[in-house]
């Protein structure tokens, strides 16, 4: 049976064996239960949890398609097209609506991510529904993987990650005359496709999300002994996100 180490997996080692994915995790019983719930609800485009292998790794079904990094560079037009923006929004709406039924179980705790915000809760957040975790087939969104960071939360909190990494212009080549109108259009397209109004403070929500999840939580986990988060600090990921936050504070108003 063919074995292939998959690209990505910044937090866990990921190996494809045959048609399934074997992932080394720290043990996420609530995430496993949530994926089984989504399967029962008939939600397509998400991995199915199949059990554990002889090494104790989680086994998931493989989602065929292309992803950012192995197949697309971060600035590939496909990833930032109007179609992709709307596809991601519709996918997140489908996922969030289905997840509401899991809330009574979810609020009992036991999630792998201990840093989720206080209630009230509306749905189950994917936790890292950024563009690099979506799967594309024929340049259209076909699925979403890496549910290890899932936790109870609000819709807008989860959408902040998806929106910011897909529709917001990059800070390193930003030109308001070229990028501001496109960003404004795509932000509106995103929320129209999701079916909820764009909150007037969406830029602030994104800033809070990036600051908390991508900066503060990474530092806290590294301090607690998480080796992968320590690698992220060494690699300079926090500096990238801090620059992104400064970019949002300076230019975000131009997109509203």
Tell me what each language-model feature is.
Residues 10-12, 18-98:
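A conserved alpha-helical element in kinase catalytic cores
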Residues 73-108, 122-127, 132-137, 189-196:
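Conserved kinase catalytic-core helix
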Residues 214-256:
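ATP/Mg2+ or Mg2+-diphosphate-binding catalytic cores
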Residues 5-6:
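Protein kinase glycine-rich loop
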Residues 12-16, 114-158:
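Active-site acidic catalytic loop and adjacent metal/ATP-binding pocket
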Residues 159-195, 210-224:
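Active-site activation/catalytic loop segments of kinase-like enzymes and analogous catalytic loops
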């Amino acid at each position: 049976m063919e074995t292939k180490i998959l690209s990505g997996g910044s937090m866990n080692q990921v190996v494809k064996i045959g048609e399934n994915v074997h992932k080394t995790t720290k043990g996420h019983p609530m995430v496993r239960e949530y994926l089984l719930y989504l399967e029962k609800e008939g939600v397509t485009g998400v991995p199915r949890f199949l059990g554990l292998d002889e090494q104790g790794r989680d086994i998931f079904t493989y989602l065929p398609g292309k992803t950012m990094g192995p197949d697309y560079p971060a600035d590939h037009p496909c990833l930032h097209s109007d179609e992709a923006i709307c596809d991601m929004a519709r996918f997140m709406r489908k996922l969030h609506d289905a997840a509401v039924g899991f809330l009574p179980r979810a609020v009992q705790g036991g999630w792998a991510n201990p840093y989720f915000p206080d209630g009230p809760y509306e749905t189950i957040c994917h936790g890292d529904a950024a563009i690099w975790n979506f799967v594309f087939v024929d340049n259209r969104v076909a699925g979403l993987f890496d549910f290890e960071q899932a936790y109870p939360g609000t819709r807008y909190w989860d959408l902040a990650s998806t929106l910011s990494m897909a529709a917001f212009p990059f800070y390193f080549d930003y030109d308001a005359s070229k990028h501001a109108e496109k960003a404004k259009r795509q932000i509106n397209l995103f929320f129209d496709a999701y079916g909820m109004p764009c909150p007037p403070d969406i830029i602030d929500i994104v800033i809070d999300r990036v600051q908390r999840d991508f900066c503060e939580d990474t530092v806290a986990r590294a301090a607690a002994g998480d080796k992968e988060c320590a690698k992220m600090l060494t690699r300079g990921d926090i500096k990238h996100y801090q620059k992104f936050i400064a970019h949002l504070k300076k230019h975000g108003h131009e997109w509203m």
